[in-house]
Amino acid sequence: MEVLMAERADLVFHNKVIDGAAMKRLISRLIDHFGMAYTSHILDQVKTLGFQQATTTSISLGIDDLLTIPSKGWLVQDAEQQSLILEKHHHYGNVHAVEKLRQSIEIWYATSEYLRQEMHPNFRMTDPSNPVHIMSFSGARGNASQVHQLVGMRGLMSDPQGQMIDLPIQSNLREGLSLTEYIISCYGARKGVVDTAVRTSDAGYLTRRLVEVVQHIVVRRTDCGTIRGISVSPRNGMTERIWIQTLIGRVLAYDIYMGPRCIAARNQDIGIGLVNRFITFRAQPIYIRTPFLCRSTSWICRLCYGRSPAHGDLVELGEAVGIIAGQSIGEPGTQLTLRTFHTGGVFTGGTAEHVRAPFNGKIQFNEDLVHPTRTRHGHPAFLCYTDLYVTIESHDILHNVNIPQKSFLLVQNDQYVESEQVIAEIRAGTSTFNLKVKEKVRKHIYSDSEGEMHWSTDVYHAPEYTYGNVHLLPKTSHLWILSGGLCRSSIVPFSLHKDQDQMNVHSLSVEQRYISDLSVTNVRVRHKLFSSDSSGKKGGRAPDYSGPDRIISNGHWNFIYPAILHENSDLLAKRRRNRFIIPFQSDQEREKELMPRSGISIEIPINGILRRNSILAYFDDPRYRRSSSGITKYGTIGVDSIVKKEDLIEYRRAKEFRPKYQMKVDRFFFIPEEVHILPASSPVMVRNNSIIGVNTRIALNTRSRVGGLVRVERKKKRIELKIFSGDIHFPGETDKISRHSGILIPPGTGKKNVKESKKWKNWIYVQRITPTKKKYFVLVRPVVTYEIADGINLETLFPQDPLQERDNVQLRVVNYILYGNGKPIRGISHTSLQLVRTCLVLNWDQDRNGSIEEVHASFVEVRANGLIRDFLKIDLVKSPILYSGKRNDTTSSGFIPNNGSDRTNINPFYFKARIQSLTQHQGTIRTLLNRNKECQSFLILSSSDCSRIGSFNGSKSHKVTKESITIKEDPTIPIRNSLGPLGTVPKIANFDSSYYLITHNQILLNKYLSLDNLKQTFQVLKYYLMDENGRIYNPDPRSNIIFNPFDLNWCFLPHDYCEETSTIINPGQFICENVCISKYGPHIKSGQILIVRVDSLVIRSAKPHLATPGATVHGHCGEILYEGDTLVTFIYEKSRSGDITQGLPKVEQVLEARSIDSISMNLEKRVEGWNERITKILGIPWGFLIGAELTIAQSRISLVNKIQKVYRSQGVQIHNRHIEIIVRQITSRVLVSEDGMSNVFSPGELIGLLRAERTGRALEEAICYRAILLGITRASLNTQSFISEASFQETARVLAKAALRGRIDWLKGLKENVVLGGMMPVGTGFKGLVRRSRQHNNIPLEIKKKNLFEGEMRDILFHHRELFDSCIPNNFPDTLE
């Protein structure tokens, strides 16, 4: 101690802050100068001093010490302003979602970084002794970023996927977080805590594996005699500090000459003095020895290892350097983060360097060398193809700037730039060839509104999804979602509305689905629509319509349609001339009877006019259908006496139109008989009145189907055979039945004849047959009874709607029997006979003002689910009555397709109150393509999405005048000229509903507008509507959109609007918000122009979404999107500059030699690539040997560099030699390959590299092998000691294998001896023992040979340098960073 006191006078007083780093430097210098013992004394004093001062100071931390940075307010405000502008651009469709996200993250990141920089100077100026300020730089745990969270702002947090949440936390912990901010920050904060715990265990496991690999490496000799080394030179962007670190403590491999003079000899260790001389003399390259070029097989020599880290001398013999290396790499693992919360380069490009203008001036460059593009923030820019020279000239100064290729130029040619303005952005990673790994990330954009999708450019299918709906964008373009309410009709699988129909809609605000409004509207045309398709009820009864039916009254037609159609209903309508049948399937059990299907047939006269009480449709119930001929009888219960007797059997020629008998009866009877009609010439094989059995041959190729009595009647041209089945009774006196002929007897009437006292269970028909005059007998024939149920309950088919008006069509159900009473019905063979037909009779109420005698009927075709269905439309043509008592002219409305005559009378003022209700819920249907077959949908364009823009000579007068001006405008100006040669289309909305839909005070209409004007306007103004391709727009009407007029934006153009001054406007064109249409016209909302009129535009509002090339578009053009559907998927690159796997996982990934996807520096592949290339150059025998050597050298260097890079990025310093020892172990194995193999090793065997070389030399033949990269786990399971392997992992497996192979463990390593409790073969006390063994090794011959061999190899390497340069990546950098 006295020594120190004495020297104190000479010491210089140093007034500087000593933090952790300065302390490190101080201690290392002290050790260099004074040695260990002396330094420890000094440090002791420092310690005492430090604690003494800390005790007297007693720093405490209170909440008042957290001072918020004053400039924070306006910084945050500024950032918010920028975000707002960004949001606006996104809304206008100028930037897409990914660009917006990137930009907002960068805005906030910059803000928070700026605040962080402000923090330090702010403390220094306002309160230098602030405890927070003092502590933040004390070198204790915690750093500026934590202080920044306390007094600056917390900034951006990441979400569980590792993406940044673009909502920053603006408050700091001093001010306190809001609830939202707290929830956002929870994940990141928890993650930090959990990470620390997980990290500790990970680092521990890593250390264990590392030690396992290298535990047997001990320093055992002084010099192994290698003459190889690796070159270290300060090039390659290596900083001088790292270079010095690499050199100090190493041993030189060669003499270093400066001219003729040798400044350092081989095997000399490098100290700080020597390094300084190297720096002064710039001698390069310097070759140094490294552990992985050591010739020892399983241990290491002193010179290859260099100085011991503990003291400044060469490492001692017997030092367990392997374990030291493993621990020095594993221990800092706890300091490495699992994932940094470094937020800047979350998106591609990391940070870009900016080129700024040196002074004000005009900028010039060659425009041919650039092409326009977008930066990653969506700003317009130019991309340079090649290096570009940019000239900035100001007055007389010319300044040249060279901009590298692939950079963005942010200014235009000949633009005036100001000083310090950013003119170009150099993309990070272009200047050097550093391998920034990019990964691709998908981001889905979801639609936030519902409507119809539109593309503004061509979109092509991705080749692999030719039939799917995945489309790629070839160039930057907008996707539009045209607004419109959606009608998801799950109720109806098909819809009756055609495109452009109008419909009354009530929107349910909650559900946002539309249910039809049944109010009566202005147009008094009634259309009825009947559709009768259904699936059959069980048991084959009349159709069962499950579910309530709906009537859509959409202002023009009332449609009635069944609510639910089942899957199995067969809905293909067959159309014949003027009648079509809609078949419906009866139940499965009835199918077995093989009856043809029945259906409802609707018949319409050819002229389409139906009279009152005419039959509109009939339905043949399959229950009343017989396949055999017979006679129908009906009447009251009991005997029908009207029937004539024998002439029943007379044949009547069937008329083409049979009279129909309306049934008033409950039941009728059918007496079956079999009838065969034969040509007159054919032989008959049975006699008249004979009795035959079943299947008797009656003619040449005819057999009887039933047995019974045969009657043969010969007509002029044919013979008619009838076979009556039944019992034959010969008359007895007491038999009462026999007296009657041709009568029906009800069941229960028994015969009086006691012998055959037999009750008849069913109805019977008694018929007397007299073959001769005197003889007769009675034939008792079975009768089929039909009860008439209400065949089809029409209430279910076409329910009456309570809201319908009285003048509606009425339908009555009438059952008709098709054949007269007692008339024989002849069935032609194999056809069925329908006995009863149910008819629908059309009728309508009388009107007070006189009746309509005829109606028009027409078929409407509705296509749904790919099937075409026909519906019947009945127009009751009526003249509406105006409340003013005047008749209105009939104006033709293009809505009634099939009759063509002007049947519609439009009257907008049917009631005064009507108009107001009308304007709210009138809409137009737009049909849309929908892939979903089960559930069609349509959009209702409703007025909430519409705006109109009026500017009438700038008049700000009241709405009234505007309205009247517009209407007084001469409506006869043709619009055709401005529209070009496109056809007209049915109007979007009826004139009345769309024109006045915006008037907010409806009373005006009645006050100011005369009807005459209206009439004129009606006739003249037509709307034009077409799509972009110039076709008249009519998409596949599978599903519908209903337009409400409120979905349309009205944009009124000024009167002096002329085309030259402003944009030419076409229907179908899309307009973004903020586009000026006319000179002083207002800005309009974005949307598609639907209607161009003389004085106004109608714009259907739409939301643009920008998409860049390569984005995937989901769905089809014109398809319906619901809220929350995926609209576009962007694929953007995100730099993996070690933010995703960094720190520990990254080290582990390198050490375990795992190939993780999309990491280009995939080492195993590289190793293989080098193997192949070198073999190609040098030919086989040399190729393998040198190939393996070179590959191994190369991969070792790059491995060391990669591991070092991770640690350095985290500020952890580890000496290269530790990493080198580990790397040596995982790269020191080779795989014996098949070709040219020796009989020593089997192919595919893993052997040590040195062993392979020695065996090759001993056998004097080349062993072919190739380098292989083992991970640390595999390397630990591939050592020479099975005990060490078994104690690491998979004990049973390792031991079993070792036993089978009969392996011997020589107990060379540490672990084996520890396991067996022997003495460990390490420790510096072993010196003498090792030295003795060195005496025997000094036979120089072997060494000389070896050296020659190696020198030879070196020369080859140097000669082939040029070759390698051309074929080996990275110019084979043999350098250590």
UniProtKB/Swiss-Prot annotation:
GO terms for biological process: DNA-templated transcription. Zn(2+) binds at C224, C294, C301, C304. It catalyses: RNA(n) + a ribonucleoside 5'-triphosphate = RNA(n+1) + diphosphate. One of its GO terms (cellular component) is mitochondrion. InterPro entries: DNA-dir_RpoC2_beta_pp (IPR012756), RNA_pol_beta''_euk (IPR050254), RNA_pol_Rpb1_3_sf (IPR042102), RNA_pol_Rpb1_4 (IPR007083), RNA_pol_Rpb1_5 (IPR007081), Rpb1_funnel_sf (IPR038120). The keyword Nucleotidyltransferase applies. Its EC number is 2.7.7.6. GO terms for molecular function: DNA binding; DNA-directed RNA polymerase activity; zinc ion binding. Keywords: Chloroplast, DNA-directed RNA polymerase, Metal-binding, Nucleotidyltransferase, Plastid, Transcription, Transferase, Zinc. It holds the Pfam family RNA_pol_Rpb1_5. It is found in: Plastid, Chloroplast. Binds 1 Zn(2+) ion per subunit. Its cofactor is Zn(2+). It is an enzyme of class 2 (transferase). Its main location: plastid. PANTHER family: DNA-DIRECTED RNA POLYMERASE SUBUNIT BETA. Belongs to the RNA polymerase beta' chain family. RpoC2 subfamily. In plastids the minimal PEP RNA polymerase catalytic core is composed of four subunits: alpha, beta, beta', and beta''. When a (nuclear-encoded) sigma factor is associated with the core the holoenzyme is formed, which can initiate transcription. DNA-dependent RNA polymerase catalyzes the transcription of DNA into RNA using the four ribonucleoside triphosphates as substrates. HAMAP family: RNApol_bact_RpoC2. This is DNA-directed RNA polymerase subunit beta''. It comes from Calycanthus floridus var. glaucus (Eastern sweetshrub). The lineage of its organism: Eukaryota, Viridiplantae, Streptophyta, Embryophyta, Tracheophyta.
